[in-house]
Structures are given as structure tokens and as C-alpha cells.
């Protein structure tokens, strides 16, 4: 709020005015904390720490119930809550109910005590095969991966040449046995020290030893890659030196095509489903691995051709390693298995891509995507299909994926703690920058709460649910955006995070989203700076997104009727405006937004007396609107009707009753509705008014106090703009009626005539207290000029009874007759004011005892109260004024009282 920064004299008043926002702050903080703790406990469940999760769920449900009760106690007036506060309150309740469901489910899991599965890829082993090299018998303690522990590097610090490999780029060629051009690429690579996390259970099962990838090559000899293990390469490396290792592999092997990678899109829902795969899929994975053994031998020969021993790259590699000690050189393996890209693949550099000229026979330009359908090598494509490519993410066409298990990479970065942000640009150099337009998920649940606050805005404008880029960022899990090419439907958010349904085999290749598919990311999340995301992103963000979007979708479903009405109205307004020719769009929007009024529920019975005026209105307006087929030719209804008379006689009430009884669209016009500070805009507003009225016929254009708009043009003080408004109003008004009286055919000189009843059922209904001030041309167009006089004796009698029908009173018929006599000359509004003041008489008699007296003990209203009120309430119309009205009515009025 800008007022918080200003230091002016109203600062204290500003703080007082901010007090009602306190419930919003409390709800936001509570929602954020619930969401964060929910994600944390779901993460504990994924790690099979059910007892800790059970205790957490119990504490969370109890605390949420207490906090919510406390907030409702502190702010008991729930009716004064804003829409944002109600939305947050509903979101908190939804999260609470979900927590209760999680609590029941975890209790069941604790009772069953299922056999725990180890999620650590470093400790998960295969009996037959899982890696292309062996592990050291005593790995260094730095490689004992523990969730949440921050490690500077995954390399073996005891290995020979460790510091030299980092300090001297020329020695980087021996750091990874699988890199192609380490010597020539090391100068373009920065090492990232961000800790690596296991990708998923599937990833840990399929790729057991990538974490120890740097340790054995530095300790073992060249015979490390024996025939026993060389048949299966490492497909995913989760170490933190991907900038050195995997970029070289991508550069050398060139498995991917950057131009074809735009078609590859990543399904985040499929990506996270791997965390909760059931044991059945483990058996399927074992079968798939047995099947892959047959294909790995054929691929090994192709990968070995791209190793550091190739003739094209050996010269530079040898020259770059001249300063390496002999013991270290001997430890370099000769035929290292290739490492396909990690999820997500590291950024590629222009220099790095252009420096691999020796590898052009195997090059596919610059490669970053791992879509098996795009790979030219059929053997590698088949291998990728068997290994479930959803673990690998798209490249420059998609930004980073926020997940705890995804290692982050930094290329040409001065700080090793900043996560990488991928660019959507097509050039390779764009991968080195951090674009502002990249959409990111919220870091914490506080940002998620903002999405709840903005849920209505996002839902009311579907255009906000799309991104500016042509590439989808992440697949949405909300129910707002249907995704036909994904297995995840709108019912997905209702499922718990830890019990996600595993996807079927091959879904990654067949279920990719379209290139231009929209997402439900709000624009608020796009503005989160990348600098705020320090270190590896947390997997709790996934749960936050699930819980928040689920609560948002539920709130949006409750507001769907209201939102649908608004959206439908906007669509209809746009269609109407598009169908109108020669009408300014902005002026038409202003007419819709400010002038269109739905008819108030005022009926004939609500108006006391004025029977003659009611009959005239029925004949001139109601009957022609309801039966247009009978009113043609000479029976054509009038297009203008003027209600004039003293103030307070019920002219506006009659107009409202006409709108209700005729079931027509009601336009309430005043001088401010048709005036603009810009030259020529007022005429456009008048034109748009009549055009829309014709389109929405039957309609009534009611102009109260029309003398302010259609005053006499003979006045010397009149300016040019007001004259133009009057002229345009008169011209548009004339177009409503046919030029040839009695003709049933349209006249070419008039755009809208009786030939089309739907376009001509428009009435200009006006009311004024100064009928003699109206311009003569406007008076001519008011064919009916109805005089609304002061209420007669019978009318006043009926009005008094109507006003006192719901009040306790002691008035008899004789008292009512006396009231009618003493209120001679009072208008309808004067009588209403008199009755209100008389109703205060019993309360005035109580004085200070009013606060202690029961309602039933207050005496009823009597005639004496009305007589006392006559001292204060006087008639508002003078006798001289009445004479003037009657004179004008006899001269220009079309009907008497």
C-alpha cells in the first residue's frame, strides 16, 4: 500500500483504515503455514517416515482448528469479510479437511507397517546389473547421500588431481572418463557445487551408481570398464559436475536435435508421479531391464566411438593433459560409457557447441531434448522408450522444473548458489541469460496464497490463464484448463500427493502437450525473481502447488455461477457491439457498464392512486411491447412520453413500474451519462445509446430531469457541446418512428421503422419538474405528455393505509379521514416523510428511557403523532407552482389527471 510509505498528516487515519485488513493478514499467514507443513508431512510419507508424519498430521489438524477458531473469535463479523478473506477462509478449511484425510490414511499405513523401500540411489543395488562400472568397496563419506544435507561437490577429494582439475581448465579432460572434449571445453564450463538429490524411486532403481560416478574413475585403472559392466551405460547422472560431464556427452554424442526439441514438452504431473510408484511397477521395471540388456550391447559400440580415444579429439586431449601426473593419467579409463542428458539437461554453450567440429559425423547440431521420437538412432530411441523419458526434461523450449530431486546447473555464473533459469529463445546463446518472462512456480505457500487471492481475477478473464510464450511451461493440475493430451484430468488435484497414480509405459512419448497449449500459471507467479530461489528447489513446492491449486479450484467452482454470468455477459456485450455498425466500441462499453439497469421490481400495486396515469402508460408502453403484432401502421406506439408535474408525485416510480411490467431493458440516463470532456465523445455516447437500445429491444430509455439535457436551445448561455448533444439526441430519436404514417413497410430514409418490430420497440420516457424549459423540438417528439398531479383525497387515504399497514397504530377510519383533510396540498413524498416523522413520536416520548424499554412496551402510533409532525413537515409545492403546472398541462398536456 502506497500510503504506508508516505508520511503525511493522515498517516494515523491510514493506519486506522487498515485495521479491517487484519483478518486478511491472519488468514494469509495461516494458509501459508498450513500449506508448507502439509507439503513437509507429505514429504515424510514419501520417505516412509510414517510415524513422524502421523505426529505431524495430528499436530497440524489440532493447531489449524485452534487457530481458525481463534481468528473467528477475534473477528466474529463474518459478513464484513471481503471476497479475498472468504476465499482464504475456504482454502484453509479445504486444507484442514485434506489434513484430516491424510491423518486417517497415515494411521492406516502405520498399522499396516509396509516394508520400507529405500529411496536412496546410492544404497539401492541390483542383483544382476545396474551400472557400467563397479563401486569402490569403501566409498568416501562425502558420497553418503542424506536428504537435506548440503554438499559442496560429489567428487572424491582424495582422488589425484582433484584441485588441479578445477583450477586448471586444461586438466579437465581426465575428470570424467565419458566426456568427449574435456580439454577444449573446460574453459567454457563452470563447476556447479549445488547438491544433487535423487530423482525418484524409478530413477534410483534404473541408475544405481551415478552418484559415485566420479569416485571410481579416479581410483580405478583403465580396466575398470570390463566386459561385465561395459554393456550397460549410465543413462542419468545425478552428480553435480554435469556442466563438465554431460555437456561433453551431449556435445560428443549429439543424441538430440535442438530444432526438433521444441516439440518436446514435459508433463510435470507425470514427472512427480514417480515418487509414489507401487511395487507392481518395480516388477515391470525388472522385466524392462532384462529386455534392455539385449539392446545395450549394440549401443555400446556406437558410444565407444565417441569416447576420448577418438582420433579427431585425441590430440587435444593429450596436449591438455601433459601436466597431469603419471599416476593420474594411468587412472583414466579408455572406453567410458556415454551418459545421456540428465533431467533437465544442462545448458549448452555456443562456444561449446561450435568447438566440436571433430564430432560432426555424429552431430545433430546442438541437442538438448530427449524425446525418443526425435532421435535419429533407432537403438537409442528404443532404449529411451524403455527408460521412461519423462525423467528427462525439455530444453530451451521449456524453463526449469522446480523439484527437490532435480539438480541445478549454472553456466558462466559467478555464484554457484543461484539456480539455472532456462531461456525460451531459439539461439544457443540465450541459454546463458536469465529472461524475465520465464514463468516460475511460487517458492513458498505465501505465493500460493496470493494465487488464491487472485483466483477470481484469473477465472473471470480466461486470457490471463495463458502465457506470453508459445511454449507451455508446466502442465497445469487445476480444473480450470482442460488438457486433452495429458492423462492428468481435472480430478487430479483431489488426489493426495503421496498417492499419485503411476503412469503407464510409453505415456511419455504419446502424451506430450501441444506446443501452443495454455497453462493456468497466474501472472503473479511469473514475476518472481530468480534470485529468490537459492540452492536446490524444494520438492515441497510441488505439494504447495497441489494444495493451493486444489483449494483454488474448489473456490472457483463455488463462484462459478457468478463468474459464468459475468463472462457470459461480457461475451454477449462483445457480440452486440460487434454487430453494431458505426458505433464507437468504447462508447458502447460505457453504455453497458454505467447505464444499463435491470428493471427494479416495482409493480402497479406499489403506487397508490394515479389510475389515469397508469392507464395511459399501459396503453402507450406495456401493451405495444407485449403485443407488437397488434400495434402496426396507425396503431404504431408512441416513441416518446413525458411525465411532468410537481416534485414528489411518483414520476420515477411510474417509470420503474413500466420497466417491470413491460419486461423491457431499462436505460437510466442522466446528464453525466452522455457528457464527456473529449470533443465529439458525447455524440458517440448518444449514438451508442440508441443503437444498443434498438438491439436490446424492447427497451425504455428513461431520462430523469430531462430539462438538464434537452433544455431550450434559445438560451444565450448555451455552449456548443451541449447543442451538439441535443441535436444528436433528436436525430437518433427521430429514427425510432416511421416517416410515413400508416405504412407497414420500412422507409428508405429511416434505418429503423415498423418493418422490424424488434428494432422499433424503444420508448424514450422522460420526467421533469420544469416542462416549460424543454426545447420545442423535444416537446414535439413527446407525443404523450402526462401530467402527474398532487395526490387526490382518495389517493392520500390509500397511501396512509399502505404506510401504516405494517406498524402498530390506533388510527381509525375517522382518523384517516381527518388525516386526509389536514394534508391537503401534500405530495406523495411529503406524505411519506410525514408518516416517518410520526412513527418517531412514541420513541421521542420515552426520552432517555428508550435504551432500557422493551420493544413490546413502546406505545403504538396515534393521530396525535401525525398532528405533532405537521408542525415540522410542510408541503413542498406552493400554490403558485401548482397553478403554473396546471396552466402548462392545459396548454401542452395530452391528457388530464
UniProtKB/Swiss-Prot annotation:
Residues 468-478 have a biased composition (Basic residues). PROSITE patterns: AAA (PS00674). ATP binds at residues 645-652. Residues 209-219 have a biased composition (Basic and acidic residues). Transmembrane segments: none annotated. InterPro entries: AAA+_ATPase (IPR003593), AAA_lid_3 (IPR041569), ATPase_AAA_core (IPR003959), ATPase_AAA_CS (IPR003960), MT-severing_AAA_ATPase (IPR050304), P-loop_NTPase (IPR027417), Spast_Vps4_C (IPR015415). GO terms for cellular component: cytoplasm. The keyword Iron does not apply. Residues 307-321, 480-496 have a biased composition (Low complexity). Residues 120-137, 364-380, 497-523 have a biased composition (Polar residues). GO terms for molecular function: ATP binding; ATP hydrolysis activity. Residues 112-144, 195-219, 302-398, 413-438, 456-561 are annotated as: Disordered. The keyword Ribonucleoprotein does not apply. Keywords: ATP-binding, Nucleotide-binding, Phosphoprotein. The modification Phosphoserine is found at residue 536. Present with 300 molecules/cell in log phase SD medium. Interacts with SPT2/SIN1. Belongs to the AAA ATPase family. This is Protein SAP1.
Amino acid at each position: 500500500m502506497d500510503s504506508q510509505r508516505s508520511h503525511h498528516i493522515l498517516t494515523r487515519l491510514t493506519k486506522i483504515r487498515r485495521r479491517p485488513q487484519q483478518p486478511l493478514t491472519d488468514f494469509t499467514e495461516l494458509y501459508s503455514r498450513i500449506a508448507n507443513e502439509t507439503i513437509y508431512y507429505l514429504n515424510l510419507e514419501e520417505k516412509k517416515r510414517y510415524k513422524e508424519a502421523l505426529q505431524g498430521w495430528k499436530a497440524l489438524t489440532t493447531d489449524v482448528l485452534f487457530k481458525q477458531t481463534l481468528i473467528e473469535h477475534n473477528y466474529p463479523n463474518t459478513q464484513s469479510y471481503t471476497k479475498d478473506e472468504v476465499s482464504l477462509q475456504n482454502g484453509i478449511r479445504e486444507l484442514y479437511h485434506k489434513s484430516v484425510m491424510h491423518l486417517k490414511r497415515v494411521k492406516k499405513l502405520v498399522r499396516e507397517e509396509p516394508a520400507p523401500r529405500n529411496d536412496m540411489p546410492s544404497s539401492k543395488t541390483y542383483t544382476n546389473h545396474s551400472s557400467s562400472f563397479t563401486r569402490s568397496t569403501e566409498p568416501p563419506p562425502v558420497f553418503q547421500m542424506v536428504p537435506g544435507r548440503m554438499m559442496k561437490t560429489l567428487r572424491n577429494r582424495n582422488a589425484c588431481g582433484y584441485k588441479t582439475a578445477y583450477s586448471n581448465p586444461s586438466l579437465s579432460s581426465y575428470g570424467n572418463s565419458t566426456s568427449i572434449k574435456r580439454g577444449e571445453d573446460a574453459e567454457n564450463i563452470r563447476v556447479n557445487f549445488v547438491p544433487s538429490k535423487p530423482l525418484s524411486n524409478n530413477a534410483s532403481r534404473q541408475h544405481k551408481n551415478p552418484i559415485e560416478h566420479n569416485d571410481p574413475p579416479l581410483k580405478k585403472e583403465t580396466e575398470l570398464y570390463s566386459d561385465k559392466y561395459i554393456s550397460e551405460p549410465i543413462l542419468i547422472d545425478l552428480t553435480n559436475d554435469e556442466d563438465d560431464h554431460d555437456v561433453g556427452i551431449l556435445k560428443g554424442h549429439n543424441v538430440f536435435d535442438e530444432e526438433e526439441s521444441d516439440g518436446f514438452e514435459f508433463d510435470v504431473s507425470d514427472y512427480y508421479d514417480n515418487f509414489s510408484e507401487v511395487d507392481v511397477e518395480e516388477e515391470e521395471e525388472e522385466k524392462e531391464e532384462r529386455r534392455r540388456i539385449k539392446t545395450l550391447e549394440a549401443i555400446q559400440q556406437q558410444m565407444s566411438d565417441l569416447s576420448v580415444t577418438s582420433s579427431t579429439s585425441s590430440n587435444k586431449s593429450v596436449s591438455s593433459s601433459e601436466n597431469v601426473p603419471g599416476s593420474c593419467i594411468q587412472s583414466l579409463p579408455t572406453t567410458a560409457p556415454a551418459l545421456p542428458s540428465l533431467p533437465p539437461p544442462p545448458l549448452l554453450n555456443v562456444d561449446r557447441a561450435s568447438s566440436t567440429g571433430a564430432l560432426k559425423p555424429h552431430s545433430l547440431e546442438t541437442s538438448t531434448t530427449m524425446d525418443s521420437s526425435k532421435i535419429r538412432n533407432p537403438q537409442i530411441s528404443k532404449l529411451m522408450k524403455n527408460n521412461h523419458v519423462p525423467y528427462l526434461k525439455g530444453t530451451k523450449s521449456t524453463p526449469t522444473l522446480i523439484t527437490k530431486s532435480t539438480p541445478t546447473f549454472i553456466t558462466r555464473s559467478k555464484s554457484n548458489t543461484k539456480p539455472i533459469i532456462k531461456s525460451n529463445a531459439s539461439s544457443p546463446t540465450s541459454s546463458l541469460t536469465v529472461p524475465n518472462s520465464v514463468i516460475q512456480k511460487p517458492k513458498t505457500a505465501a505465493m500460493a496464497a496470493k494465487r488464491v487471492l487472485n483466483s477470481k481475477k484469473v477465472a473471470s478473464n480466461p486470457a490471463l490463464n495463458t502465457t506470453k510464450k508459445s511454449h507451455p511451461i508446466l502442465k497445469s493440475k487445476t480444473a480450470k484448463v482442460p488438457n486433452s493430451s495429458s492423462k492428468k484430468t481435472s480430478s487430479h488435484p483431489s488426489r493426495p500427493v503421496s498417492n499419485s497414480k503411476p503412469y503407464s509405459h510409453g505415456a511419455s512419448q504419446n502424451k506430450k502437450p501441444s506446443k501452443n497449449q495454455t497453462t493456468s500459471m497466474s501472472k503473479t507467479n511469473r514475476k518472481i525473481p530468480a534470485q529468490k530461489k537459492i540452492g536446490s528447489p524444494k520438492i515441497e513446492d510441488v505439494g504447495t502447488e497441489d494444495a493451493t491449486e486444489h483449494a483454488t479450484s474448489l473456490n472457483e467452482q463455488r463462484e462459478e455461477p457468478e463468474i459464468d454470468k459475468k463472462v457470459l455477459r461480457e461475451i454477449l456485450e462483445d457480440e452486440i457491439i460487434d454487430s453494431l455498425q458505426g458505433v464507437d466500441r468504447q462508447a458502447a462499453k460505457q453504455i453497458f457498464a454505467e447505464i444499463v439497469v435491470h428493471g427494479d421490481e416495482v409493480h402497479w400495486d406499489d403506487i397508490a392512486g394515479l389510475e389515469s396515469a397508469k392507464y395511459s402508460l399501459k396503453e402507450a408502453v406495456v401493451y405495444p411491447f407485449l403485443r407488437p403484432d397488434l400495434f402496426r401502421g396507425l396503431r404504431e406506439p408512441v416513441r416518446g412520453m413525458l411525465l411532468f408535474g410537481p416534485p414528489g408525485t411518483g414520476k420515477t416510480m411510474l417509470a420503474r413500474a413500466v420497466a417491470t411490467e413491460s419486461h423491457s431493458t431499462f436505460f437510466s440516463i442522466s446528464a453525466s451519462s452522455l457528457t464527456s470532456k473529449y470533443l465529439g465523445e458525447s455524440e458517440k455516447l448518444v449514438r451508442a445509446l440508441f443503437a444498443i437500445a434498438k438491439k436490446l429491444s424492447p427497451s425504455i430509455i428513461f431520462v430523469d430531469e430531462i430539462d438538464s439535457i434537452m433544455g431550450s436551445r434559445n438560451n444565450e448561455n448555451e455552449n456548443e457541446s451541449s447543442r451538439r448533444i441535443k441535436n444528436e439526441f433528436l436525430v437518433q430519436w427521430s429514427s425510432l418512428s416511421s416517416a410515413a404514417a400508416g405504412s407497414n413497410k420500412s422507409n428508405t430514409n429511416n434505418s429503423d421503422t415498423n418493418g422490424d418490430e424488434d428494432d422499433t420497440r424503444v420508448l424514450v420516457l422522460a420526467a421533469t419538474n420544469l416542462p416549460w424549459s424543454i426545447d420545442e423540438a423535444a416537446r414535439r417528439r413527446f407525443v404523450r405528455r402526462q401530467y402527474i398531479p398532487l395526490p387526490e383525497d382518495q389517493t392520500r387515504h390509500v397511501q396512509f393505509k399502505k404506510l401504516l399497514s405494517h406498524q402498530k397504530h390506533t388510527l381509525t377510519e375517522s382518523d384517516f379521514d381527518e388525516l386526509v383533510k389536514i394534508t391537503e396540498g401534500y405530495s406523495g413524498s411529503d406524505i411519506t416523510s410525514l408518516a416517518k416523522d410520526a412513527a418517531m413520536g412514541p420513541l421521542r416520548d420515552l426520552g432517555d428511557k428508550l435504551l432500557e424499554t422493551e420493544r413490546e412496551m413502546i406505545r403504538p402510533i396515534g393521530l396525535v403523532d401525525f398532528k405533532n409532525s405537521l408542525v415540522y413537515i410542510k408541503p413542498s409545492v406552493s400554490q403558485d407552482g401548482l397553478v403554473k403546472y396546471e396552466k402548462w398541462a392545459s396548454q401542452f398536456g395530452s391528457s388530464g389527471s
